[in-house]
Structure formats: structure tokens, C-alpha cells
Amino acid sequence: MSFSISGKTAIVTGGANGIGLAIGRHFADKGANVMFADMDEARLVKELGENKEDSNIRYFAGDLREKLTLANLLSATIDAFDQVDILINASRQVVPSDPLNPDDDAVEMLLQQNLMTSLRLTQLVAKRMIKQAEGREKGMAGTIVNMSSIAARRTHPDLLAYSVSTAALDQMTRSLAVALAPHRIRVNAVAFGSVMSASLKDTLRDNRSFRSDIEEHTPLGRIASPTELAEAVQYLSCDGSGFMTGQIMTVDGGRSLLDPVAAPAH
């Protein structure tokens, strides 16, 4: 059983900061070719430097909500590395929402950002993976990992939009796993709790009490580093998880195991 991703080519969205950047760097360190994709070109250049033809790291800047941009991302990846074996949908947005405000468009916005962008890119990349595998009878054609959240199955009034979008992403993961299995493409997701991402850093900076609240309600008593999440994503991307598809792997330090009601009564 191999956990290696060396020589594989991966597209990682949300690659300019936080979780996406950590996953992309981890994959590159493990010998994979990585295309970092994000809207923030200045941040991509700052973190990765200029694109170099002899490097296993490239970046692509553009608005992934646009279909043409998605097609151009795939073309740029093929031009750089000739193939694509792994897709990591790590582009996501978290915004508060008002569940009683009919003018609040957060649900529509996050469904577009967190669900539809991943769905459209997955469809394009899956077609390419199927084409690459033509004439090859053994082995997987590719693997896709979606970055989800435990918010998909927990509730908080201010996170209605985020919870809805990640729950939809989980169902997309399961549905595509069944649809793509005959083509030897695996689709899984990682549902994470609190990870020290760029967005969480901003939140904790503005709300200092949140950190102790998170840590107290996480059995392992801390917030995960992006690198810890990257290790889980590597596992789902490698041959070692070759019989896993349609699964939502939880990486939350045990947080989702706790009952918020302290009283030992039902």
C-alpha cells in the first residue's frame, strides 16, 4: 500500500493562502506537480514567486466562478504538466448570515462560491481524467477531494449559509462518487473543525474570546494547523485509500463528538 503522491499532478483551488496554500505546498514537498489556483494573483506571487518552467509548482490566477476561467485553469495545467491526477477543491468562503433577513443573499453567494465552483471544475477535470485513462485497464483514473466542514451537520444561526453550502458539498461528494466510480475516479471529502486558516486568524483577531471557546469544546484541546489537514488530504489522494470513495472524513479533534448540553440527562 503506497501513500506516495510523487509524480502526480494536482490542481489545488484556494491556493493563495490558508488551507489551500498549505495543502499545495505539502503536495509539492511530497514530489507532486501542483497548480495553485486562486483569484488573488498578488498573494500567489508573494507566496510562490514567479512561475518557472523547470519547477513542479505553478499558479493560475482568475475568478473560478466563471466557466471560461475554469476551462483556462485546466488548459494551463495540461500545458504545464501534461496531465491531471488529483483535484483538491479547497476554495471556500465563510460569511455570517441572518436567518430572518429575506434580503440577505449569503446563501446564494456561498452556494455559488463553495458548491458550484467545485462542481463545475470537478466536471471538467473528471472528463480529462477519463480521457487520460483511455486504453489503460488498471489503476485509478484520478481522485478528487473536496474540503468541507463539520458545519454541514451542526447548526449555528449565524452560519446558516455556510452550513447549507457545505452540506450541499457533502451530498455532491457522495453523488459524484457513485457517478464517477465506473470511470475509476474516486471522490471524497474532508470535513474539518477549527483549522488555523487565514479566515480563522482574522476572526480570532477580532474576537479574542473565540479561541478559548473553541479549544474548550474540542477534546484534543487545540486548533489544528493547516499541515495536519494536508496530511489527511494526502491520504485520500494516494493509492493507500484506493478502496475509499464517497466518504466524508472528519478531522476536528473530536469536536463533533461532544453534546453541547452539559447535564447528563435526556
Protein language model annotation of sequence segments:
Residues 100, 154-160, 182, 221, ...:
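Active-site loop immediately N-terminal to the catalytic Tyr-X3-Lys motif
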Residues 127, 178-182, 242:
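Alpha-helical segment proximal to the catalytic Tyr-Lys
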Residues 122, 165, 173:
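Active-site helix of classical SDR
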Residues 234, 245-266:
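Short C-terminal tail/terminal secondary-structure segment
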Residues 98-111, 214:
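Substrate-binding pocket helix/loop in short-chain dehydrogenase/reductase
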Residues 3-35:
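Canonical Rossmann dinucleotide-binding motif of NAD(H)/NADP(H)-dependent dehydrogenases/reductases
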Residues 149:
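Residue(s) in the substrate-gating loop at a strand-loop-helix junction
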